[in-house]
Amino acid sequence: MPTPKKGARLGGSASHQKKILSNLAAQLFEHGAIKTTDAKAKLLRPYVEKIITKAKRGTLADRRNVLKLIPNKEVVAYLFNELAPKFEGRPGGYTRIIKLENRKGDNAPISQISLVTEQLASTEAERANRVAASKAKKAEAEAAEAKAEEAEEAPEVEADTATDKAAEAEAAEAADEAAEDK
């Protein structure tokens, strides 16, 4: 990883910042979520995302490059063997930062950074199902419109006056029963 050139350093020097990020990444992979300051969480996110992308490729060269960044063999083995397969279907966005309340002693803003291991909400199959369902709805709507147009074109038949009077009588009886129930 190149030497950081811009912005404030975590801990003062570039070498100290690299060690801080290395230790934070190792703890994140080991525990799945850690609480740290907002500044450290924001710097840790791209660092961890690049490491996970290398772990997903899984080559020997990638493993050696990750071991340069995180010199803990157990954590790297866990990352390559167990965490990387969980992220196979995810193209990116392996971490989530949630802001928490400020720290009690120095009022520093605290965040929780965690690994997102849930499956993506929309996979390709689910997307295909949604597209097919929306096309079916459109076809049903078009069919309903066609039926409505046919009904409008059909000649109107005059209603029988006897059936109208019978319907009015039934409605009056129902209203009387409703009034009696109250």
Curated annotation (Swiss-Prot):
Q: Compositional bias (Acidic residues) spans?
A: 150-161, 170-182
Ranges for the region named Disordered are: 126-182
| UniProt cross-references to InterPro entries, sorted A to Z | Ribosomal_bL17 (IPR000456), Ribosomal_bL17_CS (IPR047859), Ribosomal_bL17_sf (IPR036373)
Task: Quote any Pfam family the record assigns.
Answer: Ribosomal_L17
Q: Which GO terms describe its molecular function?
A: structural constituent of ribosome
Q: Which UniProt keywords apply?
A: Ribonucleoprotein, Ribosomal protein
Q: How does it assemble?
A: Part of the 50S ribosomal subunit. Contacts protein L32.
According to UniProt, the name of this protein is Large ribosomal subunit protein bL17
Q: Which gene encodes it?
A: rplQ
